[in-house]
């Protein structure tokens, strides 16, 4: 009986330690957020020439490539693997993008980052921060893409036609799954293979395979 209680206590302690943020987690998550925030800003600079032809092809389809703006949360969560990582990295990226200069305004950019990070965070939380495989990464990307699409529709496209709304949501979800989910997962594997993530579970997993 004593051994069972001790074992259970040890397991609980181990689980708590696994989910606790370290200094290195905060530093790396911040670096990811800043780096991706610069990418967000650059994407905003070229967004007009890119989104125009896509929207002309099918209005609402532009939400697909817009999913690049939800990459930070998924990428950060896949590397840090701690509660709040998706929200934190996406929010930092949004703040950096806003500080450099966002065409959508600072407050709306930061609000979007918070919403998009939450969309990814909820999926990882649903799996109790234990499953980091490709399907879950893509599902988290889809969640972030869905959050982005709904947020955009409420703020920028209120009263849009049903066809546009449906196209925008579907495009955002698919784009989020492929760009934020799939590409982030591949990026983490590449970084782990290069030895850049040796202090994280993602790097240790790759080393053990």
Model-assigned labels for residue ranges:
Residues 40, 44, 48, 77, ...:
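Membrane-water interface at transmembrane helix exits
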Residues 2-6, 11-76:
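Hydrophobic transmembrane alpha-helices
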Residues 38-65, 95-109, 148-171:
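Membrane interfacial helix motifs at helix-loop boundaries and amphipathic/re-entrant anchors
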Residues 60-120:
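Alpha-helical membrane segments and adjacent membrane-interface helices in multi-pass membrane proteins
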Residues 1-13, 19, 23-27, 39, ...:
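Alpha-helical transmembrane segments and their cytosolic interface
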Residues 52-59, 128-132, 196:
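Membrane interface segments of multi-pass transport proteins and intramembrane proteases
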């Amino acid at each position: 009986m004593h051994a069972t209680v001790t074992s259970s206590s040890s397991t609980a302690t181990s689980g708590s330690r696994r989910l606790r943020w370290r200094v290195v987690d905060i530093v790396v998550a911040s670096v990811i957020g800043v780096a991706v925030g610069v990418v967000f800003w650059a994407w905003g600079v070229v967004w007009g020439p890119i989104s125009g032809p896509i929207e002309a092809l099918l209005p609402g389809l532009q939400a697909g490539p817009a999913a690049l703006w939800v990459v930070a949360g998924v990428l950060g969560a896949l590397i840090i693997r701690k509660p709040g990582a998706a929200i934190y990295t996406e929010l930092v990226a949004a703040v950096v993008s806003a500080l450099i200069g966002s065409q959508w305004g600072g407050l709306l950019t930061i609000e979007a980052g918070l919403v998009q990070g939450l969309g990814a965070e909820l999926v990882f939380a649903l799996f109790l921060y234990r499953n980091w495989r490709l399907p879950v990464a893509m599902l988290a990307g889809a969640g972030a893409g869905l959050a982005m699409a709904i947020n955009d529709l409420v703020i920028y496209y209120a009263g849009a036609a049903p066809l546009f709304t449906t196209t925008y949501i579907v495009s955002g979800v698919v784009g989020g799954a492929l760009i934020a989910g799939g590409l982030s997962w591949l990026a983490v594997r590449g970084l782990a293979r290069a030895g850049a993530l040796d202090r994280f579970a993602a790097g240790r997993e790759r080393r053990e395979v």
